[in-house]
Amino acid sequence: MADAVVIPGGWFGPNAPLLMYAGDVAERRGATVHRHSWSQEFPKPDQAEIESWVAGEIAPLIDTISGRPLLIGKSLGTNAAAIAAERSLPAVWLTPLLTLPWVADALARATAPFLLVGGTADEVWDGNIARRLSPHVLEVEGADHGMYVPGPLTDSIAVLSHVVVAVEDFLDAVAWPSS
């Protein structure tokens, strides 16, 4: 049985649309999805201690799961990239904090495949870094940190569908879950 761990950002829980649908992709492939909610207020997200704080929240959950779960994290949750690297876990990172050196360094250490999803109007996204780190990248022109794009709201909803397709394509490409 496959498992996926959904790791939220700082402002919305694990059922925010990007995370909800990414987790649903894993669930439709037969995975048990574990949606984590932060148990306490987090430290400043731009300080290096945030990485160990996130690890302290997420590692105990991962330890209860047998096998190698897929990690699905957004924003603050991408500080779990160090855990993914240490344990060789595949991952989907939505709006990763690529401008934080410890997040980019953890991604560079990863041996398991991962998908990076971000937008060109997001201040913490760097498309060049993303493409250097992974062959699996969805970059949305004009999307901000919430993956909203200028124009009618339906344009931003369409971005959500592109993210779902990218997650499906990534999981197909890496044959997840493996039999």
Place the predicted regions along the sequence by residue.
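Catalytic histidine-centered segment of alpha/beta-hydrolase-like enzymes
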Residues: 45, 143-160
